Every structure is written in C-alpha cells, then in structure tokens.
Design a protein with these regions (language model features):
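Hydrophobic helical membrane-anchoring modules
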Residues: 1-4, 14-16, 20, 181-239
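Short beta-strand/loop segment that forms part of the nucleotide-sugar
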Residues: 33-44, 64-65
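A conserved acidic beta->alpha catalytic loop
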Residues: 41-50, 96-97
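Acceptor/aglycone-binding surface of glycosyltransferases and processive sugar-polymer synthases
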Residues: 67-68, 73-83, 88, 100-177, ...
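ATP-binding N-terminal substructure of ATP-dependent carboxylate-amine bond-forming enzymes
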Residues: 231-337, 542-543, 550-551, 568, ...
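A conserved helix-loop-beta module that forms one wall/lid of the active-site cleft
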Residues: 325-392
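Internal nucleotide-binding/catalytic subdomain
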Residues: 393-503, 512-514
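Active-site "cap" helix and flanking loop/linker of ATP-utilizing ligase/carboxylase catalytic domains
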Residues: 475-496, 502, 511-576
Length: 658
C-alpha cells in the first residue's frame, strides 16, 4: 500500500524561494509516496499571498493563510491539525535552508522504525560557535527537562509518524506551543540525520532576548505541572486554497468531501437538505439545490471557489458545467456537452443521428394522442428527460396508461416533454472508465441488477463484477468507444448503461461522472486507478496521469465485487447494526446507511428508498459466502422487533451465478 507524506512549510514574507521548494519536493518524492504540501502563510501580507496563489498552488498543494503573524510554532500546529490522516508528517523552513533531497534522507531514516527524526546541520568551526550560543542551551534543556535522549539535537527540520503528530495535537492545551517540547514529553525513538545546509540562509529571527523568553515559555508550559493555561487559540485561519465546491452531500458524494478534507482543501457543499451526511466534512454548507444552477453559481462566487465537481448523480453534472463556464473554472465538459449527457432528449437525438444502437423511442407531451403513442410497440417505458434515481419511470402496457402517467412523470422534470421507449427485455450492464485525450480506458464492466417490480422499473439493487457477459468485451468496447467519439468527449469520467437482449447490445443512457454504486471504492481495488482522485484533479485543472493504463483490459482479473444497494420493508427503524461492526468484516471495503434509528423508510418505488450500501469483495470461490456472512451480521429491526432488510441480491444461499 502506498505510504503518504504531508509536508508542512510555514511561510513568512517569502516571495522567491517557495515555488522552487515545492517543485523540488514534488520531483524528489514523486515516485516514492503520496505527497501533499501544506503552505502556512503566517505573515498575511498581500504581496506574499499574491505570490503564493499565483505561483505555488500546484497539484498536491494546500495554501492556508492565517489572519496575522502567530509565529512559526503556531503555524506548524495549524499544519499538524490539517495533516491528520497522513502516514508521516514533515516540517521544514521556506527559504531552501532545508533541501528537498535532505528531507528524503529523513524519510528513509524514519522507515527504520523511528518515531521522530530531526535533520540537523553539520557543525564546522564557525557554525559551532553560533550554535553553542543559543541552540546548545535549548538542547541541554530538552535533555534535562524532557525525554530527549542525551546528545540529541532538535530543529525545525523533522519528520514524524502520524501517531506522534496526533499525540502533539490532541495533547495540547494553552496558548503556548513548541513542537519538540510537546513531542518529547513522551519517550520516543528519536534520531538525528546531519546535512550540509545551503550556503545562503536567512538569518535567524531569534535574538538573545527572544531565546530567553522562549526557553522560559518551554519550562513554564512543559516542565512545570501548574504552568499551562487554556486561554486563547494558537491561530485563526483567514483563507484556505484551493476551494472546491461539491454538488450533493449524500452517501454518494461523501467520499469526495472526506478526501478533500484529508487533503486540506476548503470545501463548499451545495445540498438543499437540512443535514446531509456530507455537511460534517464540509467547511461551508450552502442549502441550495444542485439542480439550481443560478443558486450554485451565486454560492460559488460568494466563496471564491477554484473548482466544482459532483459524483454519483446525473443532473448536477450540468450545473457544474454551467458554473464552471460562467466563472472560467476548469471543466472536462462545456455546458453544451453537459446538456448532451444529462438530458435524454438531446442524448437520444445525438445517438440516433450517429447510428449508435438504442431502443425505439419518441418524445411525448400533453398534446400527444394515443394513436401517436401506438407508433411504438408495447409494453412502454416512460421517463423524465432530466431526472435521476429512477424517479418518474414507469413500465406500462397500453397507450392510455402512458398518457395517464405522463403528468406524474413530468412532476420529476423541468421539461414539458417526456421520453417514451419500447420496453426491451434485457440484462443491464454498466461500463465505467476514464477518458484521456479522447481515448477511453474501460476500468470495469458490471451487471446492473434491478428490482423486479412490474411497474417501477430500473431501481438498482446491486452491481456484480465481473459481468456475466464479459465474454462480449470487444463488442462492449467498440460501442463504448463509439459513444465517446460521437459525443466529442475528451477528458474525464465515463459511465455507460447497456442493455443486452435478444437483438444484441444497445445503449440505454450515458453520463460523465463516477457511478452511484461506489465505483470510487471498487475501481481502485480492482485496477489500481484512483478514479475519485482523477475527478478531483479535473475539477481543479490538474493533469491526470494514465500511464500504464493505455492498453488496460478489465476482463483479465480473478477479483470479484458485489455491491449491495440495500432496501428494507417500509416502516420505522428501531434498531440496526452499527456500521463499524460491519466494517470489521475483512471483505467489506465500505458500507453506509441513508437512514438511522427513528427514520421511517418509504415503499420501494425509486432509489430514494435505498436504506444503504455495502461493497463486498472476494473471488469466484468466496464471494457468495462473503455475502451470506455480511447479511448474517446485518440486522435492521422495526418497532415490532421484525427484521426489515430485504435480501434482494443474491437471495440467501443462492449461488453467485446467473
């Protein structure tokens, strides 16, 4: 598993060296780990902020500007709080005094099992005199008053494990902070690595008077049991860059918000619901509809976002493109392209014009007659042009039923027309991939399993990988590549629903997003390609590296995945198994609930009734047993003590085959 490293760089009045340092770090650590750099601007000067935002906001960089100068130690504390979750955390100065190549040596040293490694300069005759004037007193103080090993030197150039970083942050109280004093309160395995500093260094800002005050602060706050007082915060944040807007805060978008938070981004969540799941991970929750492009645009302007994205949902893709176009933000799609892949009218017209196979269809409105409907063969399927989650979709037997249901379908649409199709008996498949420079990389082909309701059709109850029709991979690939071509897609995620029936494979619909069956979890496990990371890079205008996937084939793997999109009997939930208990099962990669105790689950008519999800992994030999073990662990009971969970895919003890 790839290790992660966060590098914290306090910045004070630097307008010449930071870009070079960031570039050096990315070059040195690029192939070694998942790197993220936190620049903490501790001066709050307009010229410095301008330099940092215009020159240093590269990929893998977060810029945090503080409201005033709080000092290097407090800036480090800010970075430590934001870097939670990384395997290792390093701190270094902004003036190139600490070379990136030397940090790599610290990185190698800590892999030997150390908790904390300091980089310290080699001492020649001249440096030794300067060092002994102040730093030696500090080191003696650390050796005598704290648990620092004798002879150990400390500095602002260091790398630590995530456990040390967490201890330092959670164990702090008061308005004085000094990293080494906080870290060495406990016994640690510590090491020094010496290096030759750069010739040109910024002179230390510590006068003798400041050093004495600092030493007294260390003694008072870390050596005396009565010294520490909790009075005021160590810092206040003014701005965080980049600023990412996420459209939607349900379980389907939760991982994007969690990832953005882990990377130190400032996130603005647009979701009209009062308390969406994602709000806990967002910096700002704007209660606006993701369908309302004007409201989302106003929110994006208000918070000066640098990127906007969504996942797991269709219509916000169009909203994101409109906002991006209005604000000149990065986007894989123009507004016109986004309309093509989110509105079934324009989608069907383009597919028909270019010869892509689909089922027979027509557009209907309130003036449509039964005779016009009868131009298609029954049974019929009626759909809104611009909705999602199977809302307003019905399978109907007669033209009269179609016209009777039209008004109900249009309730889920902003259009005055609806799509009418001939029903095609089929197995549904979903293709997920990524498009780079116009070329599609297919990452998975799954069976999209649906609830067998005779009227409310298309409600997905699970994904099965690999598809039982994977033997037709070449046909699937050809159709998928043709769709990419005729839609003019050049970059970004790709999602295609196919129908396999007696007349072959036809296209149902497509989207330019990560699917709603947690493909951001399954695809990295199956392929190693981080699809969520790619989409977030798209939103911020960063390049996506697809090297190694140019000739990738997803039909050559022994891994299997069963995504459970779970539903329950309608009623009020009294008790349910805690999510953490299910995640203890070694084959459960992810799971989540859309309802909690006290929630009332509606009847199953569309995807809004979904209780939750689980991503279950295995092999051909183990997947069926793993699914059974999961459902044996899961319990959802109503107020009468009866189990509510519906075992839809596959039925209990049914073998994992068609």
């Amino acid at each position: 598993m790839e290790r992660s490293l966060a590098v914290i760089i306090p910045v004070f009045c630097s307008t010449t060296t930071v870009r070079q340092l960031v570039t050096d770090l990315k070059e040195v650590f690029g192939p070694s780990c998942r790197l993220h750099i936190f620049l903490i601007d501790d001066g709050n000067e307009a010229s410095v902020r301008k330099y940092l935002t215009e020159n240093c906001l590269l990929e893998q960089v977060t810029l945090i500007t503080l409201k005033k100068n709080y000092g290097q130690q407090n800036a480090v504390f800010c970075g430590l709080e934001k870097a939670a979750g990384y395997d290792y955390v390093a701190t270094m100065d902004d003036d190139l005094k600490h070379p990136a190549q030397e940090l790599y040596r610290l990185w190698e040293k800590i892999q030997e099992g150390y908790d904390l490694v300091y980089g310290v300069p080699e001492l020649d005759g001249k440096t030794k005199v300067k060092y002994s004037a102040g730093s030696r007193i500090r080191d003696i103080l650390f050796s005598c008053g704290l648990k620092c090993p004798a002879g150990m030197r400390v500095s602002s150039f260091r790398i630590m494990t995530k456990e040390v970083a967490k201890d330092v942050v959670t164990g702090h109280c008061g308005d004085f902070f000094y990293f080494s004093a906080a870290a060495l309160k406990k016994k640690r395995k510590v090491a020094n690595v010496t290096y030759l500093p750069q010739k040109e260094q910024r002179s230390s800002g510590y006068t003798l008077k400041k050093r004495i005050r600092l030493f007294l602060g260390i003694v008072w706050n870390y050596s005396l049991p009565f010294g520490r007082k909790n009075t005021q915060p160590l810092y206040e944040i003014d701005e965080i860059y980049p600023r990412l807007m996420v459209l939607g805060g349900s379980q389907c978008q939760l991982h994007a918000l969690q990832r953005a938070k882990a990377q130190g981004m400032y996130t603005v969540l647009a979701d009209y619901t009062k308390c969406p799941a994602g709000a806990a991970y967002a910096d700002i929750h704007e209660p606006v509809s993701t369908f309302d492009a004007d409201a989302c645009l106003a929110a994006a302007k208000k918070h000066w976002v640098q990127g906007i994205m969504t996942m797991g949902t269709d219509q916000p893709v169009y909203t994101a493109a409109l906002v991006s176009e209005a604000l000149s933000l990065p986007s894989c799609l123009t507004a016109a392209q986004a309309l093509l892949v989110t509105n079934k009218k324009y989608m069907k017209i383009r597919l028909a014009e270019t010869g892509i196979p689909t089922v027979p269809w027509m557009l209907i409105n309130k003036d449509t007659t039964e005779e016009e409907v009868k131009k298609l063969r029954p049974p019929y399927v009626i759909k809104p042009l611009d909705s999602q989650g199977q809302r307003g979709i019905f399978k109907l037997d007669t033209a009269a039923e179609v016209l009777a249901h039209l008004e109900q379908t249009l309730e889920f649409s902003r259009c005055e027309e609806a799509l009418l199709e001939e029903f095609y008996e089929n197995d549904e498949m979903t293709v997920s991939g990524y498009i780079s420079k116009g070329k599609l990389i297919i990452l998975s082909v799954v069976d999209r399993l649906v609830y067998p309701d005779p009227v409310h059709i298309g409600v997905c109850i699970g994904h099965r990988y690999p598809s039982v029709h994977i033997g037709e991979y070449e046909t699937i690939r050809t159709i998928s590549e043709d769709v990419v071509r005729v839609m003019g897609l050049q970059e970004g995620p790709f999602y295609l629903q196919l129908l396999k029936g007696k007349n072959g494979i036809v296209v149902n619909e497509l989207a330019c997003r990560i699917g709603g069956a947690f493909e951001d979890v399954t695809i990295p496990w199956l392929t190693g390609f981080d699809l969520l990371d790619a989409v977030m890079k798209n939103a911020l205008g960063h390049p996506v590296d697809v090297s190694g996937y140019e000739n990738f084939r997803c039909d050559q793997t022994e891994k299997e995945v069963a995504v459970q999109l779970m539903f329950c009997e309608p009623g009020e939930i009294a008790t349910l198994t805690e999510r953490e208990e299910l995640l203890k099962l070694p084959f459960v990669m992810d799971c989540g609930y859309n309802f909690r105790e006290g929630s009332v689950i509606p009847s199953l008519e569309n995807a809004t009734a979904r209780f939750g999800h689980a991503v279950i992994t295995g092999t051909k030999e183990t997947i069926a047993e793993n699914i059974d073990l999961f459902y044996e662990k899961l319990s959802v009971k109503n107020t009468e003590g009866k189990e509510m969970i519906l075992r839809l895919y596959p039925e209990k003890k049914e073998r994992y085959i068609v």
